Amino acid sequence: MRTKRTGILLLFLVCLFIFSGQAVSQEVGQETEIDKKVKNLLQDTKYRWRDMNVPEVDGQKLYDLIIENNYKKALEVGTSTGHSGIWIAWALSKTGGKLITVEIDKDRYEEAVKNFEKAGLSKFIDARLADAHELIPELEGPFDFVFIDADKNWYTNYAKAVIPKLEKGACMTAHNVYDSSGRFRRGRSGHGYLEYVKSLSFLETTVFSSGGGIAISYKKE
């Protein structure tokens, strides 16, 4: 009798394990309402992003960096009308994080806020209308992901203000580090950003070879 009960119990546990595995698999593969809203917005506006927004391939790269490293505390310098912010916040909606994004132009800021609402991502974004030159040094942090896509002549200054607020393992990215010929921006065109971050021993920097190029720097210590 005991053997029969043991057999039934084992069968029950096996069935429970199989069912649980299927349920988890289905949950991971399920498309959320936010996923649907974001995909619809990105598709509907695919050829209408202007005002210095990132191309889709770069947005996807930002998304992947956050998901792969489970980043949660993000900062964006230069919102524009929200394309990159949507990709970043979409990833943060899955990791449980939040984005602070800063834009100085009122019209672009207001359009970005509307786009965030359409994408269903507003609760994951703290959008601020401000001068990043003044605001970034005042932010407390810490941050584990940063995306810089604003005035190129200030990139190094942004980096200097942000680096002390980066956690170990954090990722600092900067857009448009290539010139129109596909070469690294140097001298006046790049304002020394790449040279600066590559000179820091505690940063490991590579460049994602997209249209404009994204410098990706990981803080090792």
Indicate where each model-derived feature is located:
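A short alpha-helical cap/connector motif
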Residues: 2-7, 11-145, 152-173, 177-221
